[in-house]
Amino acid sequence: MRAQTLPAGSDHAPVLACGAWLKNAACLLRGAEVLWSPIHGDLGDPANCDALDQSVEQLLDSAHGQVQAVAHDLHPDFYSTQLAQRLAARLCVPAVAVQHHHAHIAALMAEYDLREPVIGLALDGVGLGTDGTAWGGELLWVSPSEWCRLGHLQSLPLPGGDVAAREPWRMAAAALHVLDRTGEIGRRYGAVVGEQAARTVAAMLERQLNCPRSSSAGRWFDAAAGALGVSVRQQAEAQAAIALEALAADYLSALSPPECVGTYVVDQDGVLDLRGLLEQLFALADEGQAGQAARGAALFHVALAEALVGWAADAAQGHGLKTVALGGGCFMNGILSASVQAGLAARGLQALLPRAVSCGDAGLALGQAWVAARQPTAALAPQTHLQEEGAPCA
């Protein structure tokens, strides 16, 4: 177990949080102290589920009394969710569901003991949204007592569902589809993945068969990697994004950043649309010159950071706020996190990243616990299941 001390003045009722599905870690929030379990890994492995079972019992023993609630992710099928609900029933306390991206920003609010609202940028691979769809590129308004979704990245179809997250060429095919260029999928990817596979994915996209949509920032990284020929299939999580970052770092260490013109727009609903950037990446790939993949990788990072800064800064100005919290696993990308922080600072805003916990799912439990600890006392009736919803934004 690892102890973390929150800023002086923090005082929280004891809450147990069971964490996420990927990179799972649980925590006990009590007063100004957070007691962390080890990182168990992904809960698709039964051994990791057993380890989580043991950890939560140790955390409960460390509470030295009754916890007020047990917090968990919004997704009902996660083992961590089901465990939290069983524990809550056993302890006669409420189980509190906390939306994934809200929890990412809440973890920052807990770490910095923020008492006023912030704008949150939560960028990662996936998390269940309050509307039942897959989120992952979220612009949020978050206060200690409530939150709402201000906007999100333009959603992309995922041909084959979760398979698309493992095969960046599928996300590149999805990018072609949203650019009304579905007919190019076979020509661009047939020789690499097989003509039949390319035709099948093109047909799935045309007919919207098994193509759930997601606003995930991680899938935009995959689409960029696939468009530039950097990655076709991944052997590990975020492999394509890491390769893309490495190429961008090499380019930017030797050359000036590429110009970003016409790479994004934000619509009236707060949706950040990067299709202009996709068009430019495919154009670079078509040039076929040495070094164009690295230039495209640099362009993707620079343009994405510029878009995120403008998007968040406009939201902060519109809501009269000065702080932007940056959460989610995509901010492990050093180029992206440094560029967004610098860009926001240039706009007179304070940009916060986690210091003591991971910005990814390994730090999510702190946000879950912080949100649950702030539920109205009257709502925390024994054996209730509370599902927090983002309030409509003004």
Curated annotation (Swiss-Prot):
GO biological process: protein maturation
Domain of life the protein comes from: Bacteria
Xref: InterPro entries: Carbamoyltrans_HypF-like, HypF_C, HypF_C_2
Pfam families in alphabetical order: HypF_C (PF17788), HypF_C_2 (PF22521)
Keywords for the protein's UniProt record, in alphabetical order: Plasmid
GO molecular function term, any single one: carboxyl- or carbamoyltransferase activity
Family (UniProt): Belongs to the carbamoyltransferase HypF family.
UniProt-recorded name of the protein: Carbamoyltransferase HypF homolog
Organism of origin: Cupriavidus necator (strain ATCC 17699 / DSM 428 / KCTC 22496 / NCIMB 10442 / H16 / Stanier 337) (Ralstonia eutropha)
Source organism phylogeny: Bacteria, Pseudomonadati, Pseudomonadota, Betaproteobacteria, Burkholderiales
Gene: hypF1
